[in-house]
């Protein structure tokens, strides 16, 4: 008979196959409760990440669509529609806050304290940065400022460990650089810092590409491609700032991040 932990992992995989990600989150939260201070396995932490990424990803996509419609209706002067849209957007934001709060509590109370290896510490600190960044995407005023500060602190802690303990080609280190650079570009409006960080990570990985093991080659090269795509997009934006600001206001271009 499988242990409770193994049973929950199996059920999480089943929920993933069925694309029932809210239930996948519930099963993986049960797994993290069952480990009793131990570290999650690589498979378990990846399942947890996939579960939360899908649950939050659906709401982030909804929020972007609704915000875009809100801008259009505002420009047309449809005040009644704008009021209804804002109420609906607020509902989505409540869901986003709840999801982020859930994983951030789990990270702070269990996952980060139990992390022993360098790659797991970076993995969870990056995750902490990611979910504070998702809060910063829609929060305003002091709440946005706080979320941005928490994001920066988590990413910097992860970066310190990654630079000391992980190879430049390690997919977790590359994924951190990708998402950290997106944070600089989208949340802090610092395209220079974003480009510098992404370029440095890409160049350092290219220099050691021949050391890449077969198992992580695909993951690492995929993230390197995303870094390069963002650099291309951002540098073209910076070269034509005035025109691009108009384009972005009408139809924001998605910046790629690690899924």
UniProtKB/Swiss-Prot annotation:
One of its GO terms (cellular component) is mitochondrion. SUPFAM superfamilies: 14-3-3 protein. Is associated with a DNA binding complex that binds to the G box, a well-characterized cis-acting DNA regulatory element found in plant genes. Pfam families: 14-3-3 (PF00244). Interacts with CINV1. GO terms for biological process: brassinosteroid mediated signaling pathway. It comes from the Eukaryota. This is 14-3-3-like protein GF14 omega. The gene is GRF2. It is found in: Nucleus; Cytoplasm.
